[in-house]
Amino acid sequence: MARKSLIQREKKRQKLEQKYHLMRRSSKKEISKVPSLSDKWEIHGKLQSPPRNSAPTRLHRRCFSTGRPRANYRDFGLSGHILREMVHACLLPGATRSSW
């Protein structure tokens, strides 16, 4: 299980990303519309003003139950080994084990 501080840090990043999302999106649209290079540099400077952790690339998906950062399935929000355990225990509706 991941440390609680890492999980809380990720939640803080998600809140920051939601807070600055509209500002980033509008600035990016502005950059594409402005023809002069000097204006683009000014807008680019505005894009760098919010905190680093507000960037969507800083987000990392984590397992819903354990907080594990690797091997996550987007459809379920679980890591691979937890997903396998839950499917074997019939806790996920619609998920079946393959057999051939």
Curated annotation (Swiss-Prot):
SUPFAM superfamilies (UniProt xref): Glucocorticoid receptor-like (DNA-binding domain)
Keyword Plastid recorded: yes
Keywords, sorted A to Z: Chloroplast, Plastid, Ribonucleoprotein, Ribosomal protein, RNA-binding, rRNA-binding
Alphabetized InterPro entries for the sequence: Ribosomal_uS14, Ribosomal_uS14_bac/plastid, Ribosomal_uS14_CS
Pfam family membership, one: Ribosomal_S14
Entry's Gene Ontology molecular function annotations: rRNA binding; structural constituent of ribosome
Protein name: Small ribosomal subunit protein uS14c
